[in-house]
Amino acid sequence: MAHPKHQVHPEDLERPEAKDWLASHQDTALKDLRLKFGLKRPYASWIAQLEVQRKYANKFPSLLLANWIFPTGQATEQSSSERTALYKASLISSQFTVDLCAGMGIDSWAFTQRDGSLGHFANELDPGLSKLLKFNLKNT
């Protein structure tokens, strides 16, 4: 994952002012926000979410609406799309599933959305991604 200062922190997006800040900067150029706020918390997390909302709206349509918190960089780029994850989940008939390389958790989320899903185990070794994975799966 990215350098620790570049990681998204879930607690930054739970702050009371986060939604208002994101809404008021929806149309502001990302480069301008980065120049103004740099890597300062909570702004770096908020700017990262704006970037994901703009760049990946078609890849994660319902998760963006569900306030899923996305990591910066490669994990978001390489993850399954929401549509692909739901398709993969539809191929599995077991009531229990395991994802040993969960990444940011899109496939894990899809496994838990299936009818008849009774349990899912998700594992991620990267500490930053693991923190987001736990937060997102608990809150969706």
Predicted regions and their residues:
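SAM-dependent transferase fold signal centered on methyltransferase-like domains
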Residues: M1-T140
